[in-house]
């Protein structure tokens, strides 16, 4: 829901001057956030969205040709190709005049401090995982663009890579701060309340209060 929420004026956390996220600035109940909540309620009342359409239902509906589009990421490509769906990847179009942002993330490898063979683990990560062969294999397995430039250059013409790249241009880094873990459950519950007829402003206001409380508790 974040792309639609952001297009309607909402945000999760504000940002400091240096671009880092400010956990003290929760935007779920900001003016834009509450306006977004009301719009979600309107869409629910019009039958455009439903709490019964889970992520899995969305994927199945698109894979079977019952839905014209799916808002998802590279991890879903395999399901669509396996189903024989003829599809393209494009940025989400404007919503109510606003540009949807997507959360952009990266994946990497970390070595455990409790590794029984730290030297071997380091060698595996640096000398094996950090090769074009492995980077390209990870791309083929998960449709994620490689971070290694020499590997990326070999797949940069892939229409899927181009599509996700274009979508990422209007994206924002997913907050990688501890406070983000306090957001998901309360925010998800607020959407469920809206989709079952609760007052949208109250739902998001209460969710924001819960999030602030969780952050304060640490």
Q: Language-model features: where?
A:
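Short helix-initiation/N-cap motifs at beta->coil->alpha
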Residues: 50-63
């Amino acid at each position: 829901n974040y792309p639609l929420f952001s297009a309607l004026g909402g945000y999760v956390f504000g940002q400091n001057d240096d671009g880092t996220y400010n956990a003290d600035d929760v935007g779920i109940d900001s003016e834009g956030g509450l306006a977004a909540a009301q719009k979600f309620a309107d869409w629910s009342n019009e039958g455009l969205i439903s709490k019964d359409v889970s992520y899995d239902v969305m994927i199945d509906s698109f894979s079977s040709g019952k839905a014209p589009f799916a808002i998802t990421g590279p991890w879903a490509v395999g399901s669509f190709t396996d189903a024989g769906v003829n599809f393209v990847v494009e940025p989400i179009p404007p919503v109510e005049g606003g540009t949807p942002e997507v959360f952009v993330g990266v994946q990497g490898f970390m070595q455990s401090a409790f590794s029984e063979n730290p030297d071997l683990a380091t060698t595996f990560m640096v000398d094996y995982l950090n090769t074009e062969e492995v980077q390209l294999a990870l791309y083929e397995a998960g449709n994620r663009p490689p971070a290694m430039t020499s590997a990326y250059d070999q797949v940069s013409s892939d229409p899927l890579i181009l599509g996700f790249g274009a979508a990422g241009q209007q994206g924002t880094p997913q907050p990688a701060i501890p406070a983000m873990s306090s957001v998901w459950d309360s925010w998800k519950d607020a959407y469920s309340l809206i989709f079952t007829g609760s007052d949208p402003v109250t739902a998001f206001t209460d969710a924001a209060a819960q999030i602030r409380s969780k952050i304060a508790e640490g």
